[in-house]
Amino acid sequence: MYKLLLATNDQAVRDAFSAVAWENLGFKQPRMAATVEEALASLKAFHADAIAIALPEAEDALLIKRLMAAYPDLPVMDAPDKRGEVELRALELRKLLVRLNADISNDSYTLSDQMMVVRHEYFRAMMDRRIPTGKDIVRMLRLVRSKRDPTRPCVVAELKMPASSDFLRGRWHYGPQRLEMALRNMFGFEVAGLRILSCVLPGERIILLGCPMRGHEMELAENSMTGVVSEPVQECISHVYEFLGIDLSIAAMHVLPALTAMAADEAR
């Protein structure tokens, strides 16, 4: 069974967690800590597969910062004060933990490797607008310990290839996966405080996302973001053509006010 630590001094949250039949959800009864220091001491003394946090804003920020330094791959679950909501979040967490512990490769994957794979799956879902709301995106990024800031402006670019290209339709076995891995290697750079992420989505859509990282100051004004990002993207497009023979071009590029604008309800 999975082990969960609850960090909160809110009695309503504690009561909600105490009311859950945790064994039925695949968890042991959660350990509880009331402060940042108690939570860190518990993590040091006892194994935990995840932590649920409901602390005042300043304490929450401090605990997240300390976790990033010492436990960067420990999933962080929201801690609601209603039993039904706790159960929903626990099921979401269990799904993540199952993926983190799955045998997905013949290679020796570490927890960090597994989390990176799962994190990319979450980002692909977000870029495909399959995450229902902005609140879900914020919760998701916290759960998978992403360093990307969901509250600040980001750049989205859509690439296209010639209609005659058959790279994604049969020229190569696993064409989309092969192309996405190549793009992740070539576009995995940072420019002016923006980290670039690439995904190949259904419908032969190739999407690049440039977003700021938590704790890093933005070097760009919102109205200049596309101009600064365009040049390194064009350079990477040249490398893609050189190594894979794929003639990509930028079909569209625009700035979103935040990652939360990629939620499904924002597209309606």
Role assignments for model-derived ranges:
Residues 30-32, 76, 154-156, 198, ...:
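Conserved beta-strand scaffold positions in the cores of enzyme catalytic domains, especially
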Residues 84-208:
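Interdomain helical linkers/hinges and coiled-coil/dimerization scaffolds
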